[in-house]
């Protein structure tokens, strides 16, 4: 992996929400626990903050009656069936283990991809960011959709393979293989190593 400039990079944590990957989440928790996604994400989030890399969480949430949910896909129909991700409820909040810090930003949206009808692009450009690093859930849905949009918007895109997960390892792997055409696929250890000189300078 080439170098990372923390002054021009943001770490975007996709859909780390209680109803999606919390302890009692109906969607992806089994695979998250199997591969340790949340612990890996925590390491990366902590390192990014120390290195001065802005952290942005994207979260998806709808009104209680889902009047703002356009259920044009099986995934979004499941949201209604499960009666989850209602704005203002604990389930729509960021996963308890990975709660945002005071310096982090949280962007809420209503579609699968984080850029659609949201302030995400504005937040990133306002911070002088041209490189976006993605982690989160699910690799083959919201992570991939948001990463593809970031590429189309002109950002350099990195996806941290071991800080993402999907419902199955096969879905996760297939998504990363596809994303490799548009993004740099890296690992938490590689990214932490790339940030380590900046981390050392920040803490000395």
Mark where each language-model region is.
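Glycine-centered short loops/turns at secondary-structure junctions
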Residues: 50-53, 128, 154
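Short gly/pro/ser/thr-enriched loop/turn and capping motifs at secondary-structure boundaries
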Residues: 141, 164-168, 193
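Active-site acidic carboxylates
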Residues: 1-101, 195-204
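A short glycine-rich beta-strand->turn/loop micro-motif centered on a GG-aromatic cluster
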Residues: 133-136, 154-169
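Active-site-proximal loop->helix
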Residues: 168-181
């Amino acid at each position: 992996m080439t170098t990372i400039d923390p002054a021009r990079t943001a770490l975007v944590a996709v859909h780390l929400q209680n109803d999606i990957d919390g302890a009692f989440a109906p969607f992806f928790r089994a695979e998250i626990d199997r591969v340790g996604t949340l612990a890996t994400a925590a390491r990366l989030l902590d390192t990014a903050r120390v290195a001065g890399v802005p952290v942005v969480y994207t979260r998806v949430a709808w009104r209680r009656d889902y009047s703002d949910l356009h259920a044009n896909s099986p995934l979004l129909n499941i949201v209604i069936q499960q009666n989850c991700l209602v704005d203002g409820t604990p389930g729509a909040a960021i996963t308890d283990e990975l709660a945002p810090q005071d310096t982090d930003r949280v962007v809420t949206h209503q579609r699968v991809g984080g850029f659609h009808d949201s302030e995400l692009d504005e937040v990133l450009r306002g911070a002088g960011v041209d490189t976006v690093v993605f982690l989160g859930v699910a690799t083959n849905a919201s992570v991939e959709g948001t990463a593809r949009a970031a590429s189309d918007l002109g950002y350099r895109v990195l996806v941290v393979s071991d800080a993402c997960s999907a419902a199955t390892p096969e879905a996760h792997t297939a998504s990363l293989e596809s994303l490799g055409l548009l993004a740099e696929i890296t690992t938490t250890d590689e990214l932490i190593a790339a940030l380590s000189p900046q981390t050392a300078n920040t803490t000395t």
